[in-house]
Amino acid sequence: TEAMLSGNLRIIILSLFSFLGHYGVSIFVFVSGYGLSKRYDHSGESKWYIILRRAIQLWKWLVPMTLLLILDRYSGHTHFTYAYLGNNKIWTDMLFMLTFTANGLADRFIIAGPWWYFGMAFQLYVIYALFLRKSSDKVLWGIIAGVWTLLIVLSSLGLDNWVFAFRYNSIGWLPVFCVGILLSRHPVHISWRWISLGVVLFVLSLFNRYLWVISPILALFPVAAVLPLARKEPLQNVLLFMGKLSAALFVTHAFVRQQVLAHDQALPPEISGLLYLVLCIVVAWVYRLCLTYFY
């Protein structure tokens, strides 16, 4: 809102870019639901094996960075961990993050910023393994309708803190997750007419609090619109490269952002944003390279 009122086109564009970035979570959640359904709907693995396997995959990314954060905290020269947190708070935050329970602290963001995504994703893995793996399509559609109704009612009552709490956890993301499962089971071809309508509704959802509730699913339509371009080189190679870096980016980019923001007053917003983007990719690439060496 402040960006729009400023009338500065540059600030408006940068603010929109920053705001729209969080819709990447919608894409990841959709792909998670789609991939889990393809992988496990008809497999013989037990539900507990699925949950443990997914937890281990997340720990592979989280534990090394956790160790680095602890070393940084006790090095005497803090670089990455937030300075306002005492040593005891660091340990409790680490415990919450590694047990995927940090999302219960909806009143504050813990030190690793987007690490909330891993907790939310793990919740979805558990829900899928225990309840959705063998569920009918009617159950999935019922969940979608139920969550949408809940969020719309809460939003209409002005209970935005509750909406935030649900969006900070798996409940708020269940609709787009269930859509991923449904499309995995029943592939569909969507015409350009419906894609165009979806794109228009997505744009409208940016300005309407009720449409915003379903915006995680509406965000799939702009992706579908540009998907033909993504299948062409060199863009396809770039997207595949970024896809491989996605987990590492989630783990590392909050700490890169902290360092860039500490010095961004001396730089124009465009340069600061470009520097942030390049550093995020480089740090994530190095982090992934180190992990692939050990794993």
Segments predicted by a language model, with ranges:
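Membrane-interface micro-motifs in multi-pass membrane enzymes
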Residues: 2, 22-26, 109-122, 164-181, ...
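Membrane-interface segments at the starts/ends of alpha-helical transmembrane spans
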Residues: 4-16, 105
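Transmembrane alpha-helical segments and their boundary/interface "anchor" motifs
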Residues: 11, 18-27, 38-79, 83-100, ...
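Hydrophobic transmembrane alpha-helices
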Residues: 30, 34-38, 105, 124-133, ...
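Membrane-interfacial segments
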Residues: 37-44, 72-80, 135, 139, ...
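Hydrophobic alpha-helical transmembrane segments of integral membrane proteins
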Residues: 55-74, 144-165
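Short aromatic/hydrophobic helix-turn
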Residues: 95-104, 146-155, 200-201
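Alpha-helical transmembrane segments and terminal signal-anchor/GPI-anchor hydrophobic tails
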Residues: 150-248, 252-277
